[in-house]
Amino acid sequence: MAGPDRIRVGIVGAGDIVSRSHLPVLTNMADVQIAWLCDRDDARAAAVADGYGIPFAALPADPAALPAADVVLLGIPYGARWSYYEAFETRGTALFVEKPLFRTVQRHQRLCTAWQDHALAHGFQRRSLGVVRTCRDLIERGTFGPLRSAHFGMGAPGAVTRGRYYSTPELSGGGVLFETGVHGIDALVYMSRASAARVKRARMLMEAGLDLHTDAEIELLTEDGVAVEATLEISCLRDTSNRIELVFERARLRFSLFDASGRLSLDSGSAELELAPAVARGYARTHAQALYAHWCAFLGGLREGRANHTSARDALITTAIVEQCYAAAGLHGEPGAP
């Protein structure tokens, strides 16, 4: 892994998240070589591999028989990953696991103990958005005074995550909270540098084992021991703010995690300003740029043997909030887990 050697990445999954997001990024990284691509649908994997000019590997009956790689990207649904965790934990292969991760802290921690922290990455790439990192810095510096409260809203009537696995709880792991809303939860945790979290109240509306609406009140405890009140509204049943709002002592900041503009709205009480990002190296505005930055950070940490914000262990508080929200609705454990 040291020196100028290219990192060989194997990929499990050839669906949209891989073919439209990860492959355009990875195939444009000079220090990455795609070692192989496989999928349970061999024809689909072969077609995607041919389109990108990368090696295709037929999916073996036993995942442990997959070819060697320095890193494996698991770009498959939550419920299809269990056998791969077991197969790769003894091979010394680093792992990048697409979001969502887990429904319980226990299972999350169990995976973390099987890998070195720098060798196990999560897919919450919106941490790498320029606007998220800017707000994290503003909070740390106290530019607008202490952070008093935060809110994340996402969704509208009829807004349902795409994908053939979404209607199968054992494969998707959950509904709109778990599949998409978790991005906003993770962003709040990351920006506030939360070291603990407690869900004070949560209401979840379900249908056929899938959550369609969640509203919750959360207490985030920062590394400095400061409690920050946060609220969530994640829904495909009603309109939400579709943004993150951070309330400081002297200002309010608002932005969207999903519009790819990188814009930040500042309300100082006397004036409202729309702050457009200047063109700056390393400021990820689009989702593709954020994913590129996320991969760069992970692979850089892998080369150096040093964990960073891409480490799966760094997302444990996010999983704690997810677990508590589902527990409030009487749902416990990991759906379909062995």
Name the predicted role of every residue range.
Residues 1-3, 71-73, 221-223, 297-338:
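C-terminal helix-rich "cap/oligomerization" subdomain common to oxidoreductases
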Residues 1-53:
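N-terminal Rossmann-like dinucleotide-binding module
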Residues 47-55, 110-115:
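Short, conserved SAM-binding/catalytic segment
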Residues 55-68:
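Short acidic low-complexity segments
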Residues 63, 102-159:
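A contiguous active-site-proximal alpha/beta segment in oxidoreductase catalytic domains
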Residues 70-78, 82-127:
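Beta-strand-loop-alpha-helix segment that lines the small-molecule cofactor/substrate pocket
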Residues 162-229, 233-239, 313-316:
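Rossmann-like dinucleotide-binding domain that binds NAD(P)(H)
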Residues 208-211, 224-293, 311:
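NAD(P)-dinucleotide binding in Rossmann-like oxidoreductases
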